């Protein structure tokens, strides 16, 4: 999925901002969070997050769920490079493994597991 944030901000500006953020807040990671285009889940009110390095993916999902005011019975999935990251993984390790060349970690979210293929688990 193409990032709207990337489309709206030139690479050099994004890289400079990520560098500035990392220097000023070395215990946090800069994250861009955007909704998967075709998902019927609510749009988030802000895209940029400064996430504590020791936050888990599960805790980050909770933050996103609260920001979009998603009811508890609705599912939410977050993706990094089109893959569901482990819920217990630290955001700092996800950042180190998947950060973009501009210095931001790009995360998308959806109400559906849009990239998972459940056919592979089908019982014959």
Curated annotation (Swiss-Prot):
Entry-linked InterPro entries: Atg8-like (IPR004241), Ubiquitin-like_domsf (IPR029071)
Lineage: Eukaryota, Fungi, Dikarya, Ascomycota, Saccharomycotina
Lipidation (Phosphatidylethanolamine amidated glycine): 116
Gene Ontology, cellular component aspect: autophagosome membrane; cytoplasmic vesicle; fungal-type vacuole membrane
A biological-process GO annotation: mitophagy
Presence of keyword Electron transport: no
Propeptide: 117-124
Function according to Swiss-Prot or TrEMBL: Ubiquitin-like modifier involved in autophagosome formation. With ATG4, mediates the delivery of the autophagosomes to the vacuole via the microtubule cytoskeleton. Required for selective autophagic degradation of the nucleus (nucleophagy) as well as for mitophagy which contributes to regulate mitochondrial quantity and quality by eliminating the mitochondria to a basal level to fulfill cellular energy requirements and preventing excess ROS production. Participates also in membrane fusion events that take place in the early secretory pathway.
Site keyed Cleavage: positions: 116-117
Main location: membrane
Membrane topology listed for this record: Lipid-anchor
Subcellular location: Cytoplasmic vesicle, Autophagosome membrane; Vacuole membrane
PANTHER family, per the entry: MICROTUBULE-ASSOCIATED PROTEINS 1A/1B LIGHT CHAIN 3-RELATED
PTM comment: The C-terminal 8 residues are removed to expose Gly-116 at the C-terminus. The C-terminal Gly is then amidated with phosphatidylethanolamine by an activating system similar to that for ubiquitin.
Family per similarity comment: Belongs to the ATG8 family.
Keywords linked to the UniProt accession: Autophagy, Cytoplasmic vesicle, Lipoprotein, Membrane, Protein transport, Transport, Ubl conjugation pathway, Vacuole
GO MF assignments: phosphatidylethanolamine binding
Protein name: Autophagy-related protein 8
Pfam families cross-referenced by the UniProt entry: ATG8
Keyword hit for Membrane: yes
Top-level division of the source organism's lineage: Eukaryota
């Amino acid at each position: 999925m193409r990032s709207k944030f990337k489309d709206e901000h030139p690479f050099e500006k994004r890289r400079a901002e990520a560098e500035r953020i990392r220097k000023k807040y070395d215990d946090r990671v800069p994250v861009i969070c955007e909704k998967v285009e075709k998902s019927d889940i609510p749009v988030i009110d802000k895209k940029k997050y400064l996430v504590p390095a020791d936050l888990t993916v599960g805790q980050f999902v909770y933050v996103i769920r609260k920001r979009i005011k998603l009811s508890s019975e609705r599912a939410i999935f977050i993706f990094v490079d089109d893959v569901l990251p482990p819920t217990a993984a630290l955001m700092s390790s996800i950042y180190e493994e998947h950060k973009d060349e501009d210095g931001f970690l790009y995360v998308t979210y959806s109400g559906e597991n849009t990239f998972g293929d459940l056919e592979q688990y089908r019982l014959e």
